[in-house]
């Protein structure tokens, strides 16, 4: 490392973040917030008194996520990859929580928090004043210049984003004459007013009592009565679409709406550009603003909407009653299986309203969900918002452990206490049983799985299970680590992974693809694409290949033929799914660089690389083609929508660069200089604290929506640097750092 006798003993890290003018009037004393954790669960708490705050000083972790300054020992500037790893790890290990995991926000979609706030308002559960302030601050920090909000942060204003967050801010106490509300209202009316919101927005306005059910595309619950073998049964749909639809159909079937009150009456006046009583509601069913609609409706979708409307006119009462009872059973079982969390906050909110309608506010259902409201909430630099899930606890922890193994950190005695704690968390997070009513409620078996977030959330995910198995096998091989997770439990996980394979090879996320692709023709979300069924993903498939081959080396006799056949089919899928441009397309990260990183690692497990595989040659050529002059890579989120590599307008990004370097190293790319330049870019972007600063949105959820995965800039970068040193030696890169 470069040393300097004049180097300060400490360095101050800071967020380099400031509130917008509108947000600056809101917020709380950030020095009073503390993060409580429990087996991956996150609960931000505001300490009311100065005495409490003194007794429990803020940690570096809390200060970092809140955007407060923090003081750390100064680190010499790295000139070698492993020195950068050392500096990065010295910082990142401080973000481990008390229960052993690495957690963070995965916010981005701008309708999740608003749905939860609307649901809580309707049920009559007040929100703590400090949470209200921070929710307001978040929205006013991510507001667009025109005063509106989009589908996700950093996206153009839409009716859906604007009307949902307008209603949320009014519920939280902002008056209609507040400058932020006036600007939002002007944008809303310019885009077509609330009547032009998509179906999801119409639903939320209906339950709030500020839109009429006659203006909705019908959402009948009767598909639940269709034989499970037919594609129109929700059991054949993507798991998130299924969960949202079931609760929406229950509330639609009952025409549930909040009784009018003073705020509801005011919103009826504020949200529309004509008097509420004069709106022709049936004419609004397919009225969706051009700013919201992803594609124009097809004649099939128009015909489907007409058929639903006709059916609703002539519905059979006893079938409707049966369907509503079945919907309620599905909602109750989902809530019970997930310990009141539900699969994600979007369906949590609509499920809460359904259970409130069925059982009342004093039921154990609502009490249990009230206590879980905090779980997906994360207090980040902009304020408080719901994440897309109840966190990323298991996923980020597994990737972090992998990074320490790759960089040789895990074998060092000074790191083993930290990583034993991480292993303990992974141990505690494995799901040990199948869900109640597994087949009736369309669930994939979960015994032996690892979840994306927490065991309580209880959903099996193919790649999180795969990554967990891989790091458990590797970590438990290292001297000094206990064998916390038995051979039997690892074998259960392998059984589960093998059971999730799709016919013909390849892996989805939550469950094998169940429905035919033509269901996408009936997609009435207007907002998203490819959300009617699950899909095959190169990133999930590659994680499975890496996991199975790692497991097979340690346990060569367990289901050897099944594993070999699955890996072979998975490799065939990767070769089939490569794009003509040479890359692979991701659905969970941005985008070609992300999936290509995974695919090249998966192919490398079977000995395929640039020297012997045409697919790897094309992939290396693709990545090298898009390297920027500064040595980095930067890919725009717009790639997800347009299906072609688009450079990021702000230039190179740490995450995309790490992905590309990992992929090129996995493929044994012969262009050492290009890889060296990528590594040098990562080292130049490292701060004096050892951290890397936030950049562009890292993740994708339901294309084209973007979301944050802020830990990606740490563990993938540490992986890239560690693997570079392992492959090319820990050479001095001082000349490249000038």
UniProtKB/Swiss-Prot annotation:
Active-site annotation: 463 (proton donor)
Cited InterPro entries: SQ_cyclase_C, SQ_cyclase_N, Squalene_cyclase, Terpenoid_cyclase/PrenylTrfase
NCBIfam families linked to this entry: squalene_cyclas
GO biological process: ergosterol biosynthetic process; triterpenoid biosynthetic process
CDD domains in alphabetical order: SQCY_1
PFTB repeat start-end pairs: 132-173, 490-531, 567-607, 616-663
Phylogenetic classification of the source organism: Eukaryota, Fungi, Dikarya, Ascomycota, Pezizomycotina
SUPFAM superfamilies xref list: Terpenoid cyclases/Protein prenyltransferases
GO molecular function: lanosterol synthase activity
Enzyme class: isomerase
Protein name per UniProt: Protostadienol synthase A
Swiss-Prot/TrEMBL catalytic activity: (S)-2,3-epoxysqualene = (17Z)-protosta-17(20),24-dien-3beta-ol
Biological role stated in the UniProt entry: Protostadienol synthase which cyclizes (3S)-oxidosqualene to (17Z)-protosta-17(20),24-dien-3-beta-ol (protostadienol), the biosynthetic precursor of helvolic acid, a secondary metabolite which promotes virulence.
Gene Ontology CC: one annotated term: lipid droplet
EC number annotated for this UniProt entry: 5.4.99.32
UniProt family annotation: Belongs to the terpene cyclase/mutase family.
The keyword Lipid biosynthesis is assigned to this record: yes
Gene name, Swiss-Prot/TrEMBL: pdsA
Short name of one Pfam family: SQHop_cyclase_C
Keyword field: Isomerase, Lipid biosynthesis, Lipid metabolism, Repeat, Steroid biosynthesis, Virulence
């Amino acid at each position: 490392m470069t040393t300097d006798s004049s180097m300060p003993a400490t360095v101050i890290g800071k967020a380099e973040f400031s509130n917008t003018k509108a947000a600056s009037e809101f917020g709380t004393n950030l020095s009073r917030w503390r993060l409580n954790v429990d087996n991956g669960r996150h609960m931000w708490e505001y300490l009311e008194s100065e005495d409490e705050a003194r007794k429990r000083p803020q940690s570096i972790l809390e200060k970092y996520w809140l955007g407060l300054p923090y003081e750390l020992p100064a680190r010499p500037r790295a000139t070698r990859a492993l020195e950068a790893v050392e500096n990065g790890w010295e910082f990142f290990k401080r973000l481990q929580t008390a229960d052993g995991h690495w957690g963070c926000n995965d916010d981005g979609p701008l309708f999740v928090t608003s749905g939860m706030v609307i649901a809580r308002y309707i049920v009559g559960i007040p929100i703590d004043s400090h949470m209200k302030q921070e929710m307001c601050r978040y929205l006013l920090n991510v507001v667009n210049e025109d005063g509106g909000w989009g589908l996700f942060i950093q996206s153009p204003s839409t009716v859906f984003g604007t009307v949902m967050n307008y209603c949320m801010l009014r519920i939280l106490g902002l008056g209609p004459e507040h400058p932020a509300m006036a600007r939002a209202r002007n944008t809303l009316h310019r885009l077509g007013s609330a009547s032009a919101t998509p179906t999801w927005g119409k639903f939320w306005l209906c339950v709030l009592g500020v839109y009429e059910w006659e203006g909705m595309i019908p959402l009948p619950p009767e598909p639940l009565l269709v034989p499970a073998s037919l594609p129109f049964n929700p059991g054949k749909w993507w798991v998130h679409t299924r969960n949202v639809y079931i609760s929406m159909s229950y509330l639609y079937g009952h025409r549930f709406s909040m009784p009018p009150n003073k705020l509801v009456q005011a919103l009826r006046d504020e949200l529309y550009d004509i008097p509420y009583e004069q709106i022709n509601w049936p004419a609004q069913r397919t009225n969706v603003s051009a700013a919201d609609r992803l594609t124009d409706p097809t004649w099939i979708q128009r015909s489907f909407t007409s058929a639903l409307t006709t059916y609703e006119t002539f519905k059979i009462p006893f079938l409707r009653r049966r369907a509503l009872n079945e919907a309620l059973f599905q909602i109750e079982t989902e809530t019970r299986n997930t310990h009141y969390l539900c699969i994600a906050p979007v369906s949590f909110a609509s499920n809460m309203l359904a259970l409130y309608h069925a059982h009342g506010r004093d039921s154990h259902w609502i009490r249990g969900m009230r206590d879980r409201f905090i779980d997906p909430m994360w207090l980040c630099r902009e304020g408080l918002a719901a994440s897309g899930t109840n966190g990323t606890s298991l996923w980020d922890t597994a990737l972090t452990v992998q990074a320490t193994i790759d960089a040789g950190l895990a074998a060092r005695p000074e790191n083993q206490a930290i990583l034993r704690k991480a292993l303990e968390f992974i141990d505690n997070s494995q799901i040990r049983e199948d869900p109640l009513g597994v087949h009736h409620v369309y669930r994939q078996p979960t015994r032996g799985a690892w979840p994306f977030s927490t065991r309580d959330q209880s959903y099996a995910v193919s790649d999180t299970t795969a990554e967990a198995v891989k790091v458990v096998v590797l970590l438990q091989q290292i001297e000094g680590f206990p064998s916390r997770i038995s051979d039997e439990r690892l074998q259960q996980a392998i059984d589960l992974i093998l059971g999730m394979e799709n016919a013909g090879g390849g892996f989805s996320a939550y469950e094998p693809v169940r429905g035919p692709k033509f269901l996408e023709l009936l997609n009435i979300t207007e907002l998203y694409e490819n959300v009617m069924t699950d899909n095959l993903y190169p990133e999930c498939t590659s994680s499975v290949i890496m996991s199975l081959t790692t497991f097979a080396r340690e346990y060569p006799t367990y289901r050897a033929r099944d594993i070999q056949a699955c890996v072979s089919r998975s490799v065939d899928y990767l070769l089939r799914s490569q794009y003509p441009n040479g890359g692979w397309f991701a659905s969970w990260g941005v985008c070609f660089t992300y999936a290509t990183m995974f695919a090249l690692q998966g192919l490398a497990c079977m000995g395929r690389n640039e020297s012997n595989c045409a697919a790897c040659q094309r992939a290396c050529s693709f990545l090298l083609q898009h390297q920027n002059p500064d040595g980095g890579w930067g890919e725009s989120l717009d790639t997800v929508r347009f299906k072609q590599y688009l450079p990021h307008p702000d230039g190179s990004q740490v995450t995309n660069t790490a992905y590309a370097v990992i992929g090129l190293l996995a493929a044994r790319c012969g262009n050492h200089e290009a890889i060296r330049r990528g590594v040098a870019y990562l080292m130049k972007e490292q701060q004096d604290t050892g951290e890397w600063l936030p950049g562009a949105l890292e993740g994708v959820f339901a294309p084209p929506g973007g979301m944050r995965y802020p830990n990606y800039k740490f563990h993938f970068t540490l992986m890239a640097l560690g693997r570079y040193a392992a492959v090319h030696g820990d050479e001095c890169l001082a000349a490249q750092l000038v």
